[in-house]
């Protein structure tokens, strides 16, 4: 069974399951007629300076260095993946996260998951259920109309 899920999903796995045997991770499959390379869909953390200072700039600069990221990577169950090609993958807390991060590092295309940027009523509500409805047989128009109605209701 294939299931698309985020890097936090191993936290929900039962004890004793083995990577590569009971579960695995892979790139999103391409069309049979078109090679999409290694596409990755994900989220990300953005930082913004609201009050400029030397200390703030130094801290943000530090966050861009592999060492700061490797600290997060080492925390068991953090789900922290990093696109910085200078990181040491051995710093990850598990083989699972090393493998997940390798997928990210080898991506040829990265796209932000739009639902992460939507208001909760849409991203975790009508958009989510709409995608399930679409894969269960409802028409694209019917699903899109329902999602649009949700947007209209929160304006």
Positions of the model-derived regions?
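Extracytoplasmic/periplasmic, Sec-exported soluble proteins
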Residues: 1, 5, 50-55, 119-123, ...
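Extracytoplasmic/periplasmic substrate-binding proteins
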Residues: 1-52
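Long, aromatic- and glycine/proline-rich binding clefts that accommodate carbohydrate-like moieties
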Residues: 26, 74-126, 133
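Positions in alpha-helical segments
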Residues: 44, 58, 128-129
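Periplasmic-binding protein-like
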Residues: 52, 62-83
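Short, charged, surface-exposed loops that flank catalytic or proteolytic processing sites
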Residues: 133-145
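Short arginine-rich
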Residues: 150-155
């Amino acid at each position: 069974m294939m299931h698309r899920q985020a890097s936090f999903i191993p936290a929900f796995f039962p004890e004793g399951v083995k990577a590569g045997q009971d579960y695995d991770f892979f790139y999103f499959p391409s069309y049979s007629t078109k090679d999409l390379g290694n596409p990755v869909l994900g989220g990300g953390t953005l930082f913004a300076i609201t009050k400029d200072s030397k200390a703030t700039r130094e801290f943000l600069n530090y966050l861009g260095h592999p060492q700061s990221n490797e600290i997060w990577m080492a925390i068991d169950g953090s789900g922290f993946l990093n696109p910085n090609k200078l990181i040491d993958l051995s710093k990850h807390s598990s083989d699972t996260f090393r493998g997940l991060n390798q997928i990210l590092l080898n991506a040829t295309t990265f796209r932000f998951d739009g639902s992460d940027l939507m208001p909760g009523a849409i991203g975790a509500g009508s958009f989510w259920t709409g995608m399930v409805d679409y894969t269960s047989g409802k028409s694209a128009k019917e699903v899109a109309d329902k999602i649009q109605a949700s947007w209209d209701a929160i304006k």
